[in-house]
Amino acid sequence: MILIDGKKIAAELREQLRQEVVELKAKHNKIPGLTVILIGEMAPSQIYVRMKEKAANEVGLKSEVIRYPEAVEEKTVLDKIEELNKDESISGILVQLPLPKHIDKQKVIETILPGKDVDGFHPMNVGNLSSGYESSVPCTPLGCYLMIKKIEPNLSGKKAVMIGRSNLNGKPMAQLLLKENCTVTITHSKTKDLKAECLEADIIVAAVGIPELVKADWVKKDAIVIDVGINKTENGIVGDVAFEEVSKVARALTPVPGGVGPMTIACLLKNTIECFKRSQK
């Protein structure tokens, strides 16, 4: 079995991006800029933002974090986004989720200029992805897609099963695989026989938040299995796939942690650079 090493693939991608930033600076005499807005003191969000900032600096992006207290008014955040929209030195804007309850997530997402939406969550970018137009793609599915392509460059005709239908993972992942001429099935909590669906699949992407849901007898021999889940259990962090047993049947499998996570951050940097390039056309 091939262990899909997200850390290694992400490091390779970051090196490519670092070289690209050098070339862009030489060509345009400026570099892409990423601004992250962080609200409140949630520990996981603080950690994610630190990792994003470190990675951005590593590839040579201009990086800034704007921090607000938990009680910040929604208007303050929206006004700041409007200000960043107008700032030509900022290529990408990201508001770290989740947000406090008094702030409307959708309103925040829709205030970010689609051309600066590095998360790919703006309805216009969601529409662009499903219509086949160029725009930002959500970072986690993009990372999963790049890992799958690393293992199997020719995906045409493959059967792919998505477990989970979220706007964040399931739906955009399905669109990316459809573009590659996969036959895609999106499954979810109401799917009648999930195991039977999975047994048909050449590619399984599990993003449903149920610890070790996907067992060895759900996976056909030589399938590629991507585990997006991060679940805290008594035995530590586990994914949505029972790693030990599935590793005995799968052709390739991502670990948790160290699989999808590093690629998500690398793809955020990729999206920022792509936003910059589109803005220079």
From Swiss-Prot:
Enzyme Commission code(s) on record: 1.5.1.5, 3.5.4.9
Organism, as annotated: Pelagibacter ubique (strain HTCC1062)
SUPFAM superfamilies: Aminoacid dehydrogenase-like, N-terminal domain, NAD(P)-binding Rossmann-fold domains
UniProt-recorded name of the protein: Bifunctional protein FolD
Family the entry assigns: Belongs to the tetrahydrofolate dehydrogenase/cyclohydrolase family.
Subunit structure and binding partners: Homodimer.
Functional description taken from the UniProt entry: Catalyzes the oxidation of 5,10-methylenetetrahydrofolate to 5,10-methenyltetrahydrofolate and then the hydrolysis of 5,10-methenyltetrahydrofolate to 10-formyltetrahydrofolate.
InterPro entries: Aminoacid_DH-like_N_sf, NAD(P)-bd_dom_sf, THF_DH/CycHdrlase, THF_DH/CycHdrlase_cat_dom, THF_DH/CycHdrlase_CS, THF_DH/CycHdrlase_NAD-bd_dom
Disulfide bonds: none
This protein's encoding gene: folD
Keyword Cell wall biogenesis/degradation attached: no
Pathway info: One-carbon metabolism; tetrahydrofolate interconversion
GO molecular function, one term: methylenetetrahydrofolate dehydrogenase (NADP+) activity
